Amino acid sequence: MTEKANKKYKDSVFVDLFYEDESAEENEIALYNALHDEPLPEGTKIRKIRVENVLYMNFKNDISFDVGGKLIVFGEHQSTINENMPLRNLLYIGRAYEQLVPVEDRYKKKQVKLPKPEFYTFYNGEVPWAKEKELRLSDAYEESGGEEMLDLKVKMININPDQHHEILEKCPVLAEYSQFVEVVRKHQKSGEEQALQNAVEECIK
């Protein structure tokens, strides 16, 4: 499996689980609860959001949802280390707010209320990396010091099984996804042409 194909299958499975499948809403709620100390009340409704304009294809694997006054953004999960996730999320959140706020409301005297954003990215690459790390947009500024008038924080979470991050215990579907990626990786290293199919068969036994 080529590197491009390898990345594509990971993107597809993650987006299916947390955006497109019939159980996606249930999975999103489970992941939200795993990330927060206070779980969502029973029966909470969520609104799924996705920037799908052809002009913004870089966002096609980024998903988000509006729930409880918050806009939870899951930036495209990473199989390679990417320190530019704060910048990508800044571009994404602008487009997401464009979808949420009607044009006419942006020019009214009364302030438009916005869901408070939270940004998360899950890392499952093979290069060793921190169990959890906060990336900040301000770290990329050419000039440091003083008060930043604009900043954005992204929580990067390493979901490789060997990291034993507590989120995998709290969110079984994310743990299953992490384990599936690990099984595919094992079959790939064996040089199998049907690594993905063989991994699927192993995981459903």
Locate the predicted segments by residue.
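Elongated, amphipathic alpha-helical interaction scaffolds
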Residues: 1-205
